[in-house]
């Protein structure tokens, strides 16, 4: 059972992950993301990938985040703890393709702001579960605030299925064994 929520300092928050080379290795883009997060002034948990931490330190940006009262930096979490963080978040902001798929599952059903110019997961975007965010700090701040201010988000059916793939596979295997 996950105990990660005992360490979360916000009752409501945005869960954020950033790790893609095109975002973290580019000083201008990384600065835009950080400025966008800080500018929104919304409670944000950043699961800080080692590569991202290294680049934040290299570009002298880590202190900006550490000194921001509405940002909580945490180390990367195991799968179950990360699922608990997603489940308890208002929404997720990420550049991760895998997370874009995970959050649309029927068990999580969260919206995601995608910190990229394009995505290999157009199904999530077409289903209204994900939105691409242009990587300019004003766009990031505006998108965060718009998503945060939504009172009730109508989540559509997951474009990746209903979460019962394992039972369907088992049925087929049993039928032909």
Where are these regions (language model features)?
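Nucleotide-activated sugar donor-binding and catalytic core shared by glycosyltransferases
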Residues: 1-42, 52-177
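Short loop-to-beta-strand entry elements in the cores of soluble alpha/beta enzymes
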Residues: 44-46
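Conserved C-terminal portion of the radical SAM core fold
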Residues: 49
């Amino acid at each position: 059972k996950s105990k990660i929520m005992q360490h979360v300092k916000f009752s409501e928050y945005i869960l954020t992950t950033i790790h893609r080379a095109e975002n973290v290795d580019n000083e201008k883009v990384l600065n835009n993301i950080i400025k966008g997060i800080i500018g929104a002034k919304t409670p944000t948990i950043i699961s800080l990938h080692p590569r991202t931490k290294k680049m934040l330190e290299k570009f002298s940006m880590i202190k900006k985040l550490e000194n921001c009262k509405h940002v909580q930096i945490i180390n990367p979490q195991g799968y179950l703890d990360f699922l608990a963080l997603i489940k308890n978040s208002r929404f997720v902001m990420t550049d991760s393709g895998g997370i874009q798929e995970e959050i649309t599952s029927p068990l999580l059903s969260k919206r995601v702001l995608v910190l990229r110019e394009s995505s290999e997961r157009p199904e999530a975007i077409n289903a209204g579960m994900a939105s691409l965010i242009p990587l300019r700090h004003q766009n990031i701040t505006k998108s965060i605030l718009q998503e945060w201010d939504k009172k009730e988000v109508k989540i559509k059916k997951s474009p990746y299925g209903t979460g019962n793939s394992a039972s369907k596979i088992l049925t087929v295997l049993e039928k032909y064994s």
